[in-house]
Amino acid sequence: ELSPTDDPLVYSNGADDIFVNQDISLIDAESIPDHDLLCGGFPCQDYSVAKTLPTAHGISGKKGVLWWEIHRILEEKRPHYLLLENVDRLLKSPRNQRGRDFAVMLASLNELGYAVEWRVIDASEYGFPQRRKRVFIFAEQNGKLNPHSAIEKDGVLARAFPIHELDNVETFSLSEDGDDLADISSKFNVSKGDKKSPFGSGGVMKDGTVWTSKCLGNYDGEKQTLGGVLQTPGTVPDEYILDAEAVLRQRGWIYLKGGKKEMREGRDGFTYKYSEGPVTFPDALERPSRTIVTGEGGKSPSRFKHVVKFRPTKG
């Protein structure tokens, strides 16, 4: 019998499954059933472009420690496969030591005996109506893979999301700056500082060695656009309709969407020059949309919200 707080879909789709709505750090790893695939993701607040770079602390940040909970479960249960998803900034984090966080993750997976594939996938490159980039990480316990062909055609991610032939594959060892995680954490890519991460948009790691390259999606199927998935104007609720006055208001939509170079003052009184480029406004209907973020909808002006024009605006 269902209680008022129960979700009937949980019972109809998996009545005998185990659902634990609890902080994972409080769960004893031994109590987790044996499984073949661990699938998950990290909070994106530490890496996402929704925040400015100085606040993107990566795995050294408070929320980033979720990775070590995943690591704890892997260490105890040793599932054969691992599938993770995150924002693509993970490959570049943190700002002052590009690629360190991902290097620490790869090195810790190597210590547990996993071979790893990763790919940054832009949904729009495979026909979806949104330009949304995410990095997918697939790992296999004692995985046997050919590095070059795994990236280009034979890997799990390459088979699911084909790419064009690779131009160049770079390789390096994770242990160049030391063998343990502490050395990698403190020394990896330090000489490059905030200039460049060594990790390309695709790659593999096996036995502590990394092969990586820039990957371009190879897709010739149907391609959707923002205009093709919109509701018809007559079905849009009034709360989402903007009037011309709101659009033209000083420091409103046009200001927020536009490019700017201006002096600003922080809460501590420090003044600095702020600049950013323009965002297409209204959003173009003939191509995939910009990345959709939390906080869409409503009439309050925002640089990140999507605005489309159904008919000429008066005024």
Task: Provide a role label for each language-model segment.
Residues 202-315:
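C-terminal target-recognition/interaction regions appended to catalytic cores
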Residues 105, 117, 131-135, 288:
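Residues that flank catalytic or metal-binding motifs in active/ligand-binding sites
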